[in-house]
Swiss-Prot record:
InterPro entries: HPr(Ser)_kin/Pase, Hpr_kin/Pase_C, Hpr_kin/Pase_Hpr_N, P-loop_NTPase, Ser_kin/Pase_Hpr-like_N_sf. Mg(2+) binds at S163, E205. It catalyses: [HPr protein]-L-serine + ATP = [HPr protein]-O-phospho-L-serine + ADP + H(+); [HPr protein]-O-phospho-L-serine + phosphate + H(+) = [HPr protein]-L-serine + diphosphate. Coiled coil: none annotated. The keyword Transit peptide does not apply. The lineage of its organism: Bacteria, Pseudomonadati, Pseudomonadota, Betaproteobacteria, Neisseriales. PANTHER family: HPR KINASE_PHOSPHORYLASE (PTHR30305:SF1), PROTEIN YJDM-RELATED (PTHR30305). This is HPr kinase/phosphorylase.
Length: 320
């Protein structure tokens, strides 16, 4: 199961959440990970003795409760608090850290952080961060682009011209997200987010030209850090026989499953004389229309059926 260290959580959110170390630095490598029977949202929560969270947050009410504990009971309560599945304690709202809590965290290698932010906001930010960081992931071969604000993944066998097509689309004002190895993360039940690894970011490999830095060539707006995947365009090599057998009036909606998320897909035959950049733009525009409830093929078939019925009625009403 995916997991991260407390150290990484601290480094990624130190300034945003105003985090500071209070104790337990030796536990910086403690892991925070998704459990099979619990969602990511259950990783963070206010102080809970019954179902301890991996990240226990101490807010105003929790701090007041701990302060009311008698010194003889405190050790017992702390023993219940620091369950083996617990990885981190954060004292929020700028509250002072009690000496007993600090000592316990230090002795048991439990990272103890403080924050000046209110606990509800702190937990909301951490939940969103963990949901993205610990999301199930997969890597797909292809080029991921932002075309008309739609995340489009172009796939196909090597040598079909995916990179050249991407370069053409970028020159027409669209943006590159990732080339070759597209990292996909399931950040929601039906949502996939595509990103690029830091090593490959900004680069596009085009045969004959080598590695191109798209940001330097086309400017800042030619690059996007991430995008929700909404459409897959699969390029297939086609000959005359394939084009003859192609169903021109298909009304079936094709989908491809990635990480158990169904994504709309379109197959584009690659043949001599076809302007693939224009076809991709048309496919994206058509997808946007379908999101609005407009289906050109279905509309044409309905119009065709209506015309046939009118012709049939006119034929029946025609005098012999």
């Amino acid at each position: 199961m995916p997991s991260i260290s407390v150290r990484r959580l601290f480094d990624d959110n130190q300034y945003k959440l105003q985090l500071a170390w209070a104790a337990g630095n030796s536990g910086a490598d403690n892991r925070i990970g998704v459990e099979a029977d619990k969602p990511v949202l259950a990783l963070v929560g206010h102080l809970n003795f019954i179902h301890p969270n991996q990240i226990q947050v101490v807010g105003l009410a929790e701090s007041e409760y701990l302060n009311r504990l008698e010194s003889g009971e405190t050790g017992y309560q702390f023993g219940n608090l620091f369950d083996i599945s617990m990885s981190l304690v954060i004292v929020a709202n700028g509250l002072p850290v009690s000496p007993g809590l600090r000592d316990y965290c230090h002795k048991n290698d439990i990272p103890l952080l403080t924050s000046k932010l209110e606990s509800p906001y702190l937990m909301d930010v951490l939940r969103i961060y963990l949901q993205r960081t610990l999301a199930a992931s997969s890597v797909k071969h292809g080029v991921f682009l932002d075309v008309f604000e739609i995340g489009v993944l172009i796939t196909g066998h090597s040598g079909l011209g995916k990179s050249e097509l991407a370069l053409e689309l970028i020159s027409r004002g669209h943006s590159l997200i990732a080339d070759d190895a597209v990292e996909l993360f399931r950040i929601g039940p039906e949502t996939l987010e595509g990103r690029c690894s830091p090593m490959l970011r900004d680069f596009l490999e085009v045969r004959g030209l080598g590695i191109l830095n798209i940001r330097h060539i086309f400017g800042e707006t030619s690059i996007r850090p991430k995008k929700i995947l909404q459409l897959i365009i699969n390029l297939v090599e086609a000959d005359d026989e394939y084009m003859k057998q192609l169903d021109r009036l298909s009304i079936r909606t094709e989908t491809e499953s990635i990480l158990n998320v169904n994504v709309r897909s379109v197959t584009l035959p690659v043949a001599v004389g076809r302007n693939l950049a224009v076809l991709v733009e048309a496919a994206v525009r058509n997808y946007i229309l379908q999101l609005r409830g407009k289906d050109s093929t279905r509309e044409f078939l309905e119009r065709h059926q209506t015309q046939l019925k009118e012709n049939e009625q006119n034929h029946e009403n025609r005098p012999d």
